[in-house]
Amino acid sequence: MTTADRPSDPSRPARPLRRDARRNRDAIIAAARQVFCDHGLEAPLEEIARRAGVGIGTLYRRFPSRVELLDAVLADTVQAHVEVAEQALAIGDPWDGFAFYLEDTCRLQAADRGLGDAMGMRFSRAAAVEAVKNRLFELVAQVVDRAQHSGQLRADLTLEDLAFVSWANTRILPAVRAAGAPDAWRRHLALLLDGFRAERAHPLPHPPLSPRQVHRAMVTLGRRSAGDAH
């Protein structure tokens, strides 16, 4: 049996990339981060390869699927949302912490279209991104719970309701930016926050989505963005 015929040993560490391969990988990730920021997660991979100065074949050798590229690019980006949630929990007044979290989340989405897309989607094969998002959702639950226990945030608001805030903000941002009103989200958020206050609460006409329904919706959006038909 030749060396080439021997089965690979999964316990052995992967060989480090050659210098040129590492340079290409870093260039692809940097280009993808900028293209996704500007155009969202459905941006053409050909444009990423062009900006990275590599051929599309090189891109696919490094990242055989869009999801693998997303996983490499987005984990650090999504971490910014985790830091916002941690800062929100450090604010003394629970309502101020809740409002801070929503405002900074919308601000991040306005600055980075790809990040906005990622926060409204689930990618079952992007382990690094999903691990960060799971940590984020734990922190956001604490932000909401703290504000509700203080009596300032309406008691019937759920985490699933907040998913709609993210979806709505992400989808409308490109249109209002093109219309010359990139900060229009601030007015919309102020109206939403007024509706979230406990003292202004009225009975809601429809039950919230269940966690399972929101998860399924986010998976559907993630599959569409990643071009995954399965």
Which ranges hold each PLM region?
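Basic, helix-initiating cap at the start of DNA-binding domains
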Residues: 1-50, 68-71
